[in-house]
Amino acid sequence: MKYLGTSKMSLKEINEEFYKLACYFNVFPGSDRTYVMLEGLKENMPKAMALFEEILADAQVNKEAYGNLAGDILKKRTDAKLNQGQNFNKLIQYAIWGPKSPATNVLTTAELQQMDPQELVDRIHKINSFDHKILYYGPEKPQAVLDIIKQYHNVPEQLQPVPAAIEFSQQETPENRVLLAQYDAKQIYYSAVSNRGEKFDPAIQPTLNMYNEYFGGGMNAIVFQEMRESRGLAYSAGAFLITPSKLKYPYVYRTFIATQNDKMIDAMKAFDEIINNMPESEKAFNLAKDALITRLRTERITKSDVLWSYLNAQDLGLNTDSRKELFEKAQTMTLPEIKAFQEKWVKGRTYIYCVLGDEKDLDLKGLSQYGPIQKLTQEELFGY
């Protein structure tokens, strides 16, 4: 969309006009939410919105721009396969979702190259015809904002429902198994992923946050102290019970280690030991409590982030700021409460063990003790 002109204005003229108005727009396509954003000076909002709406309604195909865009995407894909972090992220996504996931739901090279850009432009023209929300952050009075929207935001009398998205399911982990992906490096990236299918429960959130702070958080947390400082088995390490982003998704427990290839099995054994038999330290707990309370005291959600925090809360069925309850309960929380939480929510889990490393340098016999090994190609991980 940012590459297109209209029947009346070239792309250069559009960019010049937005520059004069000290405004700009952006487009954010997502797997379950797409939004367009207009930002700039209050006094120029009507003109900027009129221009923006003109682009939505009258964007014209630019085949040369599409060819360049497709080429850029293919170049980024090639670069991504060379990056250790990108490979590891795709491996984690495979463990969470399985072979069919939002991460692999991408156009093939042939589809990218052969696509008619008119299809994309037609979708731009239709975006205002679907159900949507309008969010506003700024100094203008509410009624003035409504008046501007009514005047410049072009919508049909009857909006259409948003087309159903492709549904992907996060896979549970009923038994231990290993996913191994080849990457030529002297250091492995390792993660254990566990999903028992437990859905969002606001009642556990304060204790969950304190557990994460105490056990898997920063440099004073148990994981970092045990795995790096005490045992020297990892360059970096962490472990967290991750809160779902939507009600339909489950909690996922996930660990992370970066270590030398020859230390892989020792690191995995040590990690399993502290996860299932969590060390208890009042000193470390008090540091974690102080860190969490201090962060809550100083953290501010401001400007347009207030709107997004509100939408994120709605996605979990909440109508209040969950940090308030967390702050109140954190004051009196105790280490035995964290231990009880760990016994119920963490201990004894089964995992998908993910290893990204150079296979020729790894102890595959030792790795097989953690479950059957499935070797994955980059095509399986990236979807192309």
Per-region residue spans from a language model:
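Active-site SXXK
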Residues: 1-7
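Ordered, soluble secondary-structure elements with a strong preference for glycine-centered loop motifs
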Residues: 8-9, 60, 64, 201-205, ...
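Charge-rich, well-structured scaffold segments of protease-associated domains
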Residues: 13-162, 236-384
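His/Glu-based metal-binding/catalytic segments typifying zinc-dependent metallopeptidases
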Residues: 161-222, 256, 383-384
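Active-site lining segments that contact anionic ligands and/or coordinate catalytic metals
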Residues: 175-176, 187-189, 205, 220, ...
